Regions:
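Extracytoplasmic/periplasmic substrate-recognition and gating elements
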Residues: 64, 69, 145-150, 169-170, ...
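Long, aromatic- and glycine/proline-rich binding clefts that accommodate carbohydrate-like moieties
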Residues: 21-40, 45, 317-324, 370-422, ...
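Hinge/lid segment of periplasmic solute-binding proteins
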Residues: 3, 10, 14-40, 106-165, ...
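Glycine-centered hinge/linker elements that transmit conformational signals in sensory
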Residues: 196-204, 236-238, 243-277, 322, ...
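Short, solvent-exposed loop/beta-turn-alpha elements that line the ligand-binding surface or hinge
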Residues: 18, 25, 35-41, 122-137, ...
């Protein structure tokens, strides 16, 4: 009797007793995602590492909501983009447990999964229905490795890509419109091609007025100039490798060379002064300061540009997608990150991290995430009229996410990136050599790395 009584109490307390003895019916994904188990004993807080930027602030607000609901404190620890990767991989090489989760760059998937840093989330994302709540492209880019394997290491958290902001008051000024048409023979409007982008950039470059055509990425740290250049490269028909992962003849193809020459021409003719080492902060600052007519940036940084307390031109700021290249191709560099669980933390902490992601992935919380300014990957939220009309840049974002491409995400991506950052910077900013020579060196070094690493098929 005593055994029966104690067993009955344990089973009831643990929620294992089913009403009427019947098996519980299968529940839809949203219902499965919203049923949070009690937190593992002793887990009072969770630590999430991310880069230092506005979306991390928004995630902290989401974390505060979680604390109100569960009592578990969520700390979003922010590290500047330039040192974010170094900090993370140094911690991982020591199998550190300072962080329970990381909102890691899409390019980290190969290295972090192959080296055992990330927890395999395939069963978790599948059994909860979370896998089916996000768009397929974001699941592929932010969660899956190897490509096409159906193995998932991250929850798509911050969808992102490069786009452009422009000064509507300049573009729509009747005098400017007349002068532009007189000079170039077509109407002044957001550019649809890189040739038009160059024309418009030249037209608005007026040093005597402290006005310049563009602010584009040039920074040597992390992946800035590589991301900026690949916006042009992909749209010009270039790529980092062919289907067999051969870089030679692809990175240094005529299409890629033409794209790099265009990127340097934009820098030489029309870049605002002081932007020889520019990334997202500097391009936004140049726009806010009234220095440029057009500014390249990730969509994640555009909320500041529509905030009149930050940007004096907020009411006159418009947005357009990355233009087409000469052959009609149109792509944009992928940004964005997925949320992954660190494999070195205890099983209890891993479960607590899963509980947080399960809660975060609910449609209602993803709607909150989007409302704060996070770029949700949730299919329902992205398709909602509420999202598309919530911000002036959201329609361009939704369009851009249909033609994104990314840099490498294989385990040696960091070595490949260092080569491209160095060579592109030396040519575009440093003025060393020709575009062909710069891309020849990248192609040669990349080819050797890919062959030595066994990645060439």
């Amino acid at each position: 009797d005593r055994i029966a009584e104690e067993h009955q109490k344990m089973l009831e307390d643990g929620g294992f007793v089913k009403e009427g003895g019947a098996m519980a019916e299968e529940k839809p994904a949203e219902a499965m995602m919203s049923e949070l188990p009690p937190p593992p004993e002793g887990i009072k807080e969770l630590n999430i590492l991310w880069a230092q930027w506005d979306p991390a602030d928004y995630l902290q607000e989401i974390g505060n909501m979680y604390e109100q609901e569960t009592g578990i404190k969520v700390n979003v620890i922010q590290e500047p983009w330039g040192s974010f990767g170094d900090l993370f991989f140094t911690e991982m090489s020591a199998q550190g447990t300072s962080y329970d989760m990381v909102v890691g760059d899409s390019q980290w998937l190969g290295q972090s999964s192959s080296q055992g840093h990330y927890l395999d989330m395939t069963d978790f994302l599948t059994s909860t229905g979370i896998k089916d709540s996000v768009t397929p492209a974001t699941l592929q880019y932010y969660g899956e490795y190897p490509p096409g394997s159906g193995t998932y290491w991250g929850y798509p958290t911050e969808g992102d890509a490069d786009g452009w902001a422009y000064r509507k008051d300049l573009f729509e000024n009747p005098d400017e419109m007349a002068a532009f048409k007189d000079k170039y023979g077509y109407d002044l409007a957001p550019p649809e091609t890189y040739a038009q982008l160059k024309d418009i950039a030249e037209f608005f470059t007026r040093p005597e007025e402290n006005l310049y055509g563009v602010a584009i990425y040039t920074q040597a740290d992390y992946d800035a100039i590589t991301m900026g250049f690949e916006n042009a490269m992909f749209s010009f028909g270039g790529n980092w490798a062919d289907a067999g992962n051969n870089a030679m003849g692809v990175v240094n193809s005529p299409e890629s060379v033409a794209a790099l020459e265009m990127y340097k021409e934009l820098y030489d003719c029309c870049q605002a002064p002081g932007l020889s080492n520019a990334f997202f902060v500097e391009t936004n600052d140049a726009f806010i300061g009234g220095q440029v007519a057009m500014s390249m940036n990730y969509f994640a940084f555009f909320p500041a540009l529509v905030n009149p307390e930050v940007n004096p031109y907020a009411a006159d700021t418009g947005f357009f997608v990355n233009p087409k290249g000469p052959g009609g191709d149109q792509y944009a560099a992928l940004g964005g990150q997925g949320m992954s669980i660190i494999s070195y933390i205890s099983p209890d902490r891993q479960q607590a991290a899963k509980d947080f992601i399960k809660w975060f992935a609910q449609d209602s919380i993803q709607q909150e995430w989007a409302a704060l300014g996070g770029y949700t990957c949730n299919s329902k939220v992205l398709q909602s009229e509420e999202f598309l009309s919530a911000a002036p840049f959201n329609p361009a974002f939704a369009e851009t996410m249909t033609f994104v491409k990314d840099f490498w995400n294989i385990p040696i991506y960091g070595e490949l990136l260092r080569v491209s950052q160095t060579e592109l910077g030396n040519y575009v900013v440093g003025g060393q050599g020709t575009a062909q020579e710069a891309l020849d060196r990248i192609a040669e070094e990349h080819q050797k790395m890919l062959e030595d690493g066994g990645f060439v098929k």
